[in-house]
Amino acid sequence: MWPTFKGEEWDKGMDQFAEKHFLVLDQFLPPSVLETVFRYFASVEAEDRLKAAAIGPGKERTRISEIRSDFVHWLDRPLMPELETFFEGMDAVRAAIAESLFLSLRGYEFHLAKYPKGAFYKPHFDQFNSRENRMISVVIYLNENWEPEHGGA
């Protein structure tokens, strides 16, 4: 079951997000959804469907290895019924953030990313002129048994 996106704790989180421009939500994904995403990612990896990451939309998409060296797999909701519970939950998250912060968040896109040892993602601007619609980025770490000393955001 997805967390409730209402109440005092949610309101405090949205206040922090509005003030600091980021929010950390531990244990965000319900365990059953997390397991489904793990299984899906394992199949993507086993089938060698991860591609070198790039920045920019459509024809402007460019691989710049000095900015990021990870590998990604874009999620396409109509083609991935096994991830429907994930997408339904993210619909609820999008709606709750939009309502709390008075934003017009109409859509989203997701990808899975793998960072092999030594891989990186440097801060950059990739809000290209052809698309000026990004308002919020959501990063969900799927690392099992992750500890703060392992590093990362």
Summary of predicted features, one role per range:
Residues M1-S137, Y141-A153:
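Fe(II)/2-oxoglutarate oxygenase catalytic core
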